[in-house]
């Protein structure tokens, strides 16, 4: 046996050389890693810098969530999916891709889902901006520095930050759209066609609205081929889009038709000032600062998909002022999804402006050097104020549309100053709840109760966006004799409910929040 073992070993000289080779590989690893980092430094920066930017509000709020949808919907839905409480039709109608990530992670780790989304938010933001950088470099053929500059401009603009605040499914869907754009431009070969088809399916599965955009972009290409008698191009596009189209129809049916919601919403015969303000007004407000750069850069970006994307979103926003009927989706969501192409046009405009200025004499000699630093400084300062200032101290510009745009990134369904107080009141409520007691919650509080009072889920009554007395009636109809509620004190309430109705009395007040009982 010993002789056999010696025979199977390599000769002593070979063994020594293998050992030396292994040591050299270990010694050279930092050099190899350094070369890789230098080779991909722009792509790494396009991912890591936005990830850091989006991490700032998460750090500022501590262990609590950032974003309305995050705590109001993502956390409760993840808990329900992991517990098997969601049916197939409900799952399909939700556009399930994000929950197909969060629910298994929660089911395996059992970590509070708040932490899952605190980590997911920055990663999704970094991924989306990296995908944009990749498109600018590969799809538009921009140099690395220009592509990184365009990506960072987009990541610092307040509309993009608003998307990152709580529209995680939009970020996921936009990532797949941006990855698909170079393939739509050049989809020669079955491998590229298959990859494009998969990306469209993922964009649809991530979010219904990004699914619409993905299908519109491919559909526009197909129609272009048909009008030019390019039947092979048309057939190829139809084949690529077919799986995504089938999934979208199924998702729309499960999410809108089956529950009886429908695809259209009734509107006034004559547009009101309010409807015009919330649609066209918000669109102008969101991109007012970029309009000069967009106008300058529009001709510098001949990409058909970006133009189709822009025209479609603007046209859909305009449907909000149509008489009688309009889409069920609120128009501001399409204004937000217009962010990526308009930021690309603005970045092209800024680059063109810097390159085209010819200094003369005197003060004009330094003008080209001042344009980019000045714009960058204004962009960074405005982003910093939006990210870091509390909601109550937000700059005036960010308070114009509080129902559509959070005044600050450091809030969720409640402002930063109330986060710890709400957690304390939830703990106090947990100690007062027995078998005959229900905790009624507004949608703003419901996700918090689900996340931090998991043992009391069966005694939570969610009255959504209605008045508290609706929750009282719901609790009584289920046989509860004692009713608790957490809300702000009179005069301090958020979400269009500044005061608490008569019949409630304060049990415990912490800051501007209080635990109430219904008499």
Where are these regions (language model features)?
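Start-transfer (signal-anchor) and selected internal transmembrane alpha helices
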Residues: 1-57, 367-377
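Extracytoplasmic
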Residues: 9, 47-48, 127-130, 163, ...
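Membrane-interface helix-loop-helix junctions at transmembrane boundaries of multi-pass membrane enzymes
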Residues: 32-40, 226-240, 292-317, 326, ...
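Membrane-embedded helix bundles of polyisoprenyl
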Residues: 47-54, 98, 102, 107, ...
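Transmembrane catalytic cores of multi-pass membrane glycosyltransferases
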Residues: 54-59, 65-70, 94-95, 168-169, ...
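Short hydrophobic/aromatic helix or loop-helix immediately within or flanking a transmembrane segment
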Residues: 73-76, 90-113, 203
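Hydrophobic/aromatic-rich transmembrane helices and adjacent perimembrane loops
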Residues: 163, 170, 213, 328-364, ...
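Signature aromatic-anchored transmembrane alpha helix within multi-pass, membrane-resident enzymes
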Residues: 239-245, 353-397
């Amino acid at each position: 046996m010993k002789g056999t073992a010696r025979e199977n070993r390599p000769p002593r000289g070979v063994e020594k050389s293998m050992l030396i080779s292994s040591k050299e590989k270990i010694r050279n690893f930092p050099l190899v890693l350094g070369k890789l980092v230098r080779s991909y430094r722009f792509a790494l920066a396009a991912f890591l810098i936005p990830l850091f930017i989006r991490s700032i509000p998460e750090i500022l709020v501590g262990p609590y969530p950032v974003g309305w949808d995050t705590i109001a919907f993502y956390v409760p839905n993840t808990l329900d999916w992991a517990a098997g409480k969601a049916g197939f039709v409900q799952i399909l109608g939700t556009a399930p891709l994000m929950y197909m990530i969060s629910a298994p992670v929660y089911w395996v780790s059992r970590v509070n889902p708040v932490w899952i989304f605190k980590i997911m938010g920055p990663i999704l933001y970094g991924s989306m901006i990296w995908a944009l950088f990749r498109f600018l470099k590969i799809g538009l053929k921009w140099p690395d520095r220009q592509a990184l500059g365009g990506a960072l401009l987009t990541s610092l603009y307040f509309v993009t930050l608003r998307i990152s605040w709580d529209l995680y499914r939009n970020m996921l869907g936009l990532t797949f759209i941006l990855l698909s754009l170079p393939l739509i431009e050049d989809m020669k070969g079955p491998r590229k066609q298959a990859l494009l088809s998969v990306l469209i399916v993922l964009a649809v599965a991530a979010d219904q609205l990004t699914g619409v955009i993905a299908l519109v972009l491919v559909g526009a290409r197909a129609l272009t081929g048909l009008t030019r008698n390019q039947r092979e191009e048309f057939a190829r596009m139809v084949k690529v889009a077919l799986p995504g189209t089938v999934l979208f129809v199924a998702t729309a049916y499960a999410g809108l038709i089956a529950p009886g919601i429908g695809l259209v919403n009734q509107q006034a015969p004559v547009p009101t000032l309010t409807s015009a303000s919330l649609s066209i007004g918000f669109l102008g407000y969101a991109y007012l600062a970029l309009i000069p750069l967009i106008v300058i850069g529009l001709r510098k970006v001949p990409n058909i998909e970006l133009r189709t994307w822009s025209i479609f979103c603007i046209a859909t926003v305009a449907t909000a002022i149509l008489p009688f009927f309009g889409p069920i989706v609120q128009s501001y969501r399409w204004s937000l999804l217009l962010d990526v192409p308009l930021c690309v046009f603005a970045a092209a405009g800024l680059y063109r402006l810097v390159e085209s200025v010819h200094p003369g004499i005197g003060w004009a000699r330094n003008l080209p050097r001042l344009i980019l630093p000045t714009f960058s400084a204004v962009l960074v300062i405005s982003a910093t104020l939006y990210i870091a200032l509390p909601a109550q101290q937000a700059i005036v510009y960010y308070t114009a549309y509080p129902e559509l745009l959070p005044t600050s990134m450091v809030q969720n369904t409640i402002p930063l100053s109330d986060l710890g107080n709400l957690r304390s009141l939830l703990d106090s409520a947990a100690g007062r709840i027995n078998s005959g007691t229900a905790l009624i919650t507004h949608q703003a509080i419901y996700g918090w109760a689900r996340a931090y009072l998991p043992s009391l889920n069966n005694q939570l009554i969610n009255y959504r966006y209605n008045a508290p007395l609706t929750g009282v009636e719901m609790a009584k109809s289920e046989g509860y004799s004692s009713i608790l509620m957490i809300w702000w004190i009179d005069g301090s309430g958020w979400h269009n409910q500044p005061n608490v109705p008569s019949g409630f009395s304060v049990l415990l007040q912490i800051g501007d929040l209080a635990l109430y009982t219904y008499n």
